[in-house]
Structure formats: structure tokens, C-alpha cells
A protein has these predicted regions:
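A domain-level signal for the structural core that forms small-molecule/cofactor-binding pockets
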Residues: 1-66
Length: 66
């Protein structure tokens, strides 16, 4: 049973997450040549920008308004 872990900035709605999960699972199924959506788990991890750095840049400083 594959697990897809998605780490992203906080702020997506449940509906947006549902759409993301659907696209990811459908993409894996297409790429693998089949399978059942029910065999996948998608785990969303919401991360505050203040807790995410890319190199030396803190994301809350780099993207303060998004």
C-alpha cells in the first residue's frame, strides 16, 4: 500500500487537498499502469513558513504575503 507524503505551506482548504490527492493518485496509477485508488494513502503535512528554510532563506521572509 503506497503512502504519498505531501509537505507544503499551511493554508490549503480541505477541498484543495482532496483535489491534490486525486491528481497524485491518478498520476501514480497512470504511471504504474493501473491499480486501485483505494490502495493509496496520501498524508498531508502542513508546515508554517517560519518553520521552513531553503538554504539560508526562511520562507516567511522570502514569501511574506503568500
Amino acid at each position: 500500500m503506497p503512502i504519498i507524503r505531501v509537505e507544503m505551506f499551511t493554508g490549503r482548504s480541505p477541498e484543495q487537498k482532496k483535489n491534490i490527492a486525486r491528481e497524485l493518485v491518478d498520476g501514480f496509477i497512470r504511471g504504474a499502469g493501473g491499480g486501485s485508488p483505494q490502495s493509496f494513502n496520501v498524508v498531508f503535512v502542513d508546515v508554517d513558513k517560519q518553520d521552513w528554510a531553503h538554504g539560508y532563506d526562511m520562507m516567511n521572509e522570502k514569501y511574506p504575503d503568500t
